[in-house]
Swiss-Prot record:
Biological or metabolic pathway of the protein: Amine and polyamine biosynthesis; agmatine biosynthesis; agmatine from L-arginine: step 1/1
GO molecular function, one term: arginine decarboxylase activity
Recorded family membership: Belongs to the prokaryotic AdoMetDC family. Type 1 subfamily.
Lineage: Archaea, Thermoproteota, Thermoprotei, Thermoproteales, Thermoproteaceae
InterPro entries: AdoMetDC_fam_prok, ArgDC, S-AdoMet_deCO2ase_core, S-AdoMet_deCOase_pro-enz
Site (Cleavage (non-hydrolytic)): E73, S74
Protein name: Arginine decarboxylase proenzyme
Reaction equations catalysed: L-arginine + H(+) = agmatine + CO2
First-tier enzyme category under EC: lyase
Subunit structure: Heterooctamer of four alpha and four beta chains arranged as a tetramer of alpha/beta heterodimers.
SUPFAM superfamilies xref list: S-adenosylmethionine decarboxylase (SSF56276)
Keyword tRNA processing part of the UniProt annotation: no
Length: 126
C-alpha cells in the first residue's frame, strides 16, 4: 500500500483586491483625501508605513488618481477613474500579523461604492 504525505505549502503573502463601482466622482478626484484613506487603512491593518506616493492624471477617460503606499509588509494601492465612477483597490501583505481584508473593508467604507467585488488569494510557493 502506498501512502501519500501532504506537505503544507507555506503562505508567504495574503492578497486582497477588488473593484468599486458607483463611487462619487469628486471623491475619486480628491488626491489628498485618497492619501489619507490609504494611510489610515495601513494603520487599521497593522501594517508599517514606509512611504506614500500619489499621482493625478488628467485627460478624458484616463483622468484619475493613483495612490500607492509602500508598507514594510508589501503595498496598498488605489487607482481611480472618476469619469466611470470606478476604482480598483489592491492590498498585499507578507506580514503574519497584518490584516489586508481590514484595510480593504476600511477603504470600501470610505469610498462608499454602490457595489463592489472583492477577491482573496494566498500567495505561496512550493
Amino acid at each position: 500500500m502506498q501512502t501519500t504525505t501532504q506537505v503544507k505549502t507555506p503562505i508567504v503573502g495574503k492578497h486582497v483586491y477588488g473593484e468599486l463601482y458607483g463611487v462619487d466622482e469628486a471623491l475619486l478626484r480628491d488626491e489628498e483625501k485618497l492619501r489619507r484613506i490609504v494611510i489610515e487603512a495601513a494603520h487599521i491593518a497593522k501594517m508599517h508605513l514606509v512611504e506614500v506616493n500619489s499621482w493625478r492624471f488628467k485627460g478624458g477617460d484616463k483622468e484619475g488618481v493613483s495612490v500607492i503606499a509602500l508598507v514594510l509588509e508589501s503595498h496598498i494601492a488605489i487607482h481611480t477613474w472618476p469619469v466611470y465612477n470606478y476604482a480598483t483597490v489592491d492590498v498585499y501583505t507578507c506580514g503574519e500579523h497584518s490584516d489586508p481584508m481590514a484595510a480593504f473593508r476600511y477603504i470600501v467604507s470610505q469610498l462608499a461604492p454602490k457595489r463592489f467585488t472583492v477577491n482573496y488569494s494566498d500567495r505561496s510557493y512550493k
